[in-house]
Amino acid sequence: MDRNEALQLVKQNLKGENLVKHSLAVEACMREFAMRFGEDVEKWGLSGLLHDLDYDFTVNDPPNHALKTVAMLQEYNLDDDILHAIKGHDHKAELKSRMDISLYVVDPTSGFITACALMHPSKKLENVDLKRMKKRFKESAFAKGANREQMQECVKMGVELDDFLQTCLNAMQKISVDLGL
């Protein structure tokens, strides 16, 4: 499966525009970390792009989230490590590899950064910076859905929180037009 095929699958299965944008943001962050670590950029990108493919089917059935995605992707013969990372992002598999950990920590972070942009008067990623993100990170009422403990597990992939947040922001800024931010 190539990226275009994956993107088409995402657009066919995710009804909400924001979910598609979330998938694009996670993909961008995953690709950025793959480049940094010298890993397969396409594989890492696919894990990010496809990780929530089943969301509309499992929104009221959380125990099957990620598992249904893996089932939906069986016919595409994706590498097992991509499928494992997808399961791992929602606690359905042990986080073993750097890709597993990256997807797990990037998932809430993309939403957190999006919230930072939307709270700025311009609503643009270009006006978000590390200082603003660090301030918002400490505010428990801000972007409640973005699990801070989960985000802080970035250290398990060998990246300190500030560097992690900045790298994700940079990745998302590169596709800001696609994200509408």
Where would I find each of the regions flagged by the language model?
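C-terminal binding/interaction regions
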Residues: K124-L125, L130-L179
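Amphipathic alpha-helix face/heptad-repeat signature
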Residues: H22, S102-V105, C168
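Divalent metal-dependent catalytic cores for phosphoryl transfer on phosphate-bearing substrates
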Residues: F37-F142
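Acidic/His-rich, divalent-metal-binding segments that scaffold phosphate/diphosphate chemistry
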Residues: M1-N60
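Metal-centered catalytic cores of metalloenzymes
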Residues: N4-G16, A28, A93-K96, Q166-C168, ...
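Predominant activation on well-ordered alpha-helical scaffold segments within soluble catalytic domains
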Residues: L7, K11, L24-E27, R31, ...
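Long, low-complexity, intrinsically disordered polar/charged segments
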Residues: G38-T58, V159-G180
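Structural signal for hydrophobic packing residues in well-ordered secondary-structure cores
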Residues: L14, M30, A34-F37, Y76, ...
